[in-house]
Each structure stands twice: as structure tokens, then as C-alpha cells.
Amino acid sequence: MAALSTGLSTSSGDLTQSADEDGFLDAPLLPSQKLQSVIRPHFHPVPTICISILLALVNLAYVTLAVVAIYFCLFSEKEKKCKQSIDPFQLSTVLVISKLVLWLLHVVNERFAQHHHCKARSRGFLHLYRSTRHLKALPLIIHSTGNAALLLILSVQDSFTSNSQLYPCLILSVLLLELILSVICLIIYTVRIYRFNKSKPRPDIIEEEKINAFHGHVNPEIGFRHSASLEEVVEKQGDTIEYLKHHNALLSKQLLALASNQD
């Protein structure tokens, strides 16, 4: 009797499980277009181009105004009128204060770019993040170095006042060098981001799978390259795992939302 009751309960459990599986299989399937829209990630461009162009124009305008101010306040016949217009400040003080404002703009631009590049990194664009990691910070580094050079010039100016017209020319030379180097970096960065946004690539891991499938082999180790260092391999593996975790969590939420809408 005990064996009979055990067999009946097992059979009843199998029937219940079979009924549940049949009900699950009979559930309406999600449309293929909706599945494709969920599985294929939507491309989000990196919105840093306009800020970089605007910052380059501000940098150019600042250096142009500095050249005009130095010329009219030191080398033209309107020297007294120019000094009266900036009174009670000296010309070097005005240049340094405006230079500080420009440096703060570069700090804001670097933080803004870093924020959006981290978001692109979480979406799987690991190569873009690495290739622009130092490039986007170069203008800020250049201007920080220029600030140190200006402090050195001003400290020497207070100690040696024999040639008062030499120091504004040295300041102008530093500003021109900063302008050339930072604008070159901003242009290179802007072109690279513009090409990335225009091409609208898929995440790096999807592109690598496509290339491996085309060549007929599968890469057994994520991020492994024979020419890469161990640090690069570990960093890329960590970034890839973080992207996959983020993508799987987002995909699960979207599939659950679509399934609830079908009910």
C-alpha cells in the first residue's frame, strides 16, 4: 500500500509538472521584431563634440584678446588709455584671472567627457574608452602645465623688474603654445568621436564574435592577444565581464517588461 501511494503521488507530481510545462509552452510567443529590438542594443552617440569645438573657440578667442591687450597696453600709443580701462588691475593680473577661468572650463570639459566615456564603456565600447583615455585629458594637462609656467614667469617678474616688457611677451608665448597644442588635441579628439558616432558600431564583443565567425575560429580567452601585455588582458577581461553583466541585467528587465505587456 505504501508503495502504491508513493507511485500515485509520483505520478500525480509528474502530471502536474507536465501540465505546467504544457501551459508554459502554450503561452503566446513574443513577436520577433520586439525580440530583435530588445536583443540588439540601441546605439547612443557620445555627446562631447559640441563642447570640444566650443572650448577650442573659447581658447582661440582668449588668446586673440590677450594679444590685442598686450599690444595696446605695451606697444601702442594708447598705452595710458588701455591701462585706465583695466585699472586698478595690472595687465598680467587680468591675463592670469582670465586664464584661470579658461582652465576651469577645461576641467569641466574633462569631467564631462569622462562621464560620457564611462557610460560608453559600460555599453561595451571598450576600444573607444581606451583609445581616448589619455587624449581627452591632454588639453587639461597642457593648460595645467601652462599655469605652472605662468606662475614661474610672474615670480621672476616680481624679483627682476628691469625689463617690464619682456614678461608679457613670455606670458603670450606660453598662451600661444597652449593654444596650438590644446587645439590640436581637441581637433583630433573631435574627429575621432565624430567618426565613432557616424559609424554607429555595435559593442566590441559583438564585433569580435562577428570577426571570429568570419575567419572560422573562436577566441578561447576573452580579450587575449599574443601581443598584449598581461595588464591589458586583465583590464579588458574585467571590462568585458562588467559589460556582459550590465547587458544581461538590462536584457532581463526588457524581456520581463515585454512579457508582462503580452499578458
Curated annotation (Swiss-Prot):
It comes from the Eukaryota. GO terms for cellular component: late endosome; lysosomal membrane. Pfam families: TMEM192 (PF14802). It is found in: Lysosome membrane; Late endosome. PANTHER family: TRANSMEMBRANE PROTEIN 192. Homodimer. The gene is tmem192. This is Transmembrane protein 192. Keywords: Endosome, Lysosome, Membrane, Transmembrane, Transmembrane helix. It is a multi-pass membrane protein.
